[in-house]
Amino acid sequence: SRNPAKLLPGAYDPCLEGGASRTLRFSVSATPFSDANALSRPESFGFILTNPEGIYSYNKKMILRGNEYIAEDGETMLWDGKGTTVTVTAYAPYADVVDGSVAVSCPSNQATASELSAADFVLWKGSVNPSTDLSDGKIQLRLGHLNTRLIVKLTLDGAPVVTSKVASLSVGGLKAEGKCDLSADSPVVV
């Protein structure tokens, strides 16, 4: 990646010319699994920007400082001056990416709203053209869930059980960890 703050005095970088050569700014929201009608702002998230030209590509942990997201390492990230369409992947909670994949896990007990929100894994992946796709100069990231649905049909002696009569249910033997291949066109957790 390139950073104008790291250029030597008098140095010239032709990729820093043009209207698109400006600092990346973010507007980020996520819908928590515990309340599909609410929006939240994660305290941190993983951000991967892949530029097909190889320059101005980033893989960062973003943290919320005040009302702005910044790279945890303090690097100023820029769009390239050409306005190149890039692939952006954003996910929360943050975890290190290993070989293009991120480990995902969920707590075994999700009985309360806080336990349920601890199970959140939200993701957004798509193409962004900095010349046309920014709103107020910011990249808009609306992180959504990779949903997993477990359907349990309860029977007692072969007859269906009315679920309103079930006060509590425990299911054992489920795998609570997986990996999400962020390099896939449509990432899924397996």
Question: Whereabouts are the PLM-identified features?
Answer:
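Sec-type signal peptide cleavage vicinity
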Residues: 1-190
